[in-house]
Amino acid sequence: MGDYIVVLEAPIIVKDVESVEEAIEAAVNKVVNALEKEKLDFVRVELGYSKCPVCGAHFESAFVVGNVGLVGIYLTLKVFNAQSLEHAERIAKAVVGRALKKSH
């Protein structure tokens, strides 16, 4: 049994946004509120980054089309007493996923 730090990436859809900055703010707020409702304030929430396949530069994982935003969010948490890294990932997905599904 071991302790593992698990990083999950979640795609968050937000509506009625006009800019990337607004989409990022709305997505982060949505995730933080969902986690706080479930008393999961120990989960670190960060904006995701993508890598350009052409030049290799990193950019914020946020896109807006037709007032709908898609934002990639990284969720980091420590899982205690897991049997393996895969087990820790399953635990993290179950705990965080349950909280995010309730927020829809």
Curated annotation (Swiss-Prot):
<dbReference type="Pfam" id="PF04475">
    <property type="entry name" value="DUF555"/>
</dbReference>
<protein>
    <recommendedName>
        <fullName>UPF0212 protein PH1312</fullName>
    </recommendedName>
</protein>
<dbReference type="InterPro" id="IPR007564">
    <property type="entry name" value="UPF0212"/>
</dbReference>
<comment type="similarity">
    <text>Belongs to the UPF0212 family.</text>
</comment>
